[in-house]
Amino acid sequence: MAQHQVNYASNAGLPVALTTVDKLVNWGRTNSLWVLTYGLACCAIEMMASGASRYDFDRFGVIFRASPRQSDVMIVAGTLTKKHAEFIRRLYDQMAEPKWVISMGSCANTGGMFNTYATVQGVDRVIPVDIYLPGCAPRPETLQYAVMLLQKKLRKRSIFQKQKPKRLV
């Protein structure tokens, strides 16, 4: 959790918290990430395990959503085929700004061992990716670490300036 200094000013005996709009909005975004899951292969099993009681994504403020219009983050887990490419782009375009993408697993990152005419060699050829998770299949702890990296990125973000996407991992 982020530790921000909050200044309290006394106004007619009532405590008033003073902070910047950036910190307030970033706090809200950091602690309420709504994730659109796009599981295509074995990595989706690990993604589902991260939402179960043993790893409990809810404590990070992560809620899995089924609608792209209600999501901030898209997690792509598995091999992306050319037939899925148009569909995943449409889902990405339906997400509200600001939006982030996590590419989970070797197949989503680079196409994995499938170098065929039907496979897209990385999700980043279709949509911009913020965080790459290596492995086959990455453990739920790795996905939790990626979410914590994304939260760290969101805490530093300014809401008034358009920032270029920067890869974290």
Swiss-Prot record:
It comes from the Bacteria. SUPFAM superfamilies: HydA/Nqo6-like. InterPro entries: NADH_UbQ_OxRdtase-like_20kDa, NADH_UQ_OxRdtase_20Kd_su. It is a peripheral membrane protein. Binds 1 [4Fe-4S] cluster. [4Fe-4S] cluster binds at residues 42-43, 107, 136. Its cofactor is [4Fe-4S] cluster. It comes from Nitratiruptor sp. (strain SB155-2). GO terms for cellular component: plasma membrane; respiratory chain complex I. GO terms for molecular function: 4 iron, 4 sulfur cluster binding; iron ion binding; NADH dehydrogenase (ubiquinone) activity; NADH:ubiquinone reductase (non-electrogenic) activity; quinone binding. Keywords: 4Fe-4S, Cell inner membrane, Cell membrane, Iron, Iron-sulfur, Membrane, Metal-binding, NAD, Quinone, Translocase, Transport, Ubiquinone. It catalyses: a quinone + NADH + 5 H(+)(in) = a quinol + NAD(+) + 4 H(+)(out). This is NADH-quinone oxidoreductase subunit B. The keyword Nuclease does not apply. Belongs to the complex I 20 kDa subunit family. It is found in: Cell inner membrane. NDH-1 shuttles electrons from NADH, via FMN and iron-sulfur (Fe-S) centers, to quinones in the respiratory chain. The immediate electron acceptor for the enzyme in this species is believed to be ubiquinone. Couples the redox reaction to proton translocation (for every two electrons transferred, four hydrogen ions are translocated across the cytoplasmic membrane), and thus conserves the redox energy in a proton gradient. Its EC number is 7.1.1.-. NDH-1 is composed of 14 different subunits. Subunits NuoB, C, D, E, F, and G constitute the peripheral sector of the complex.
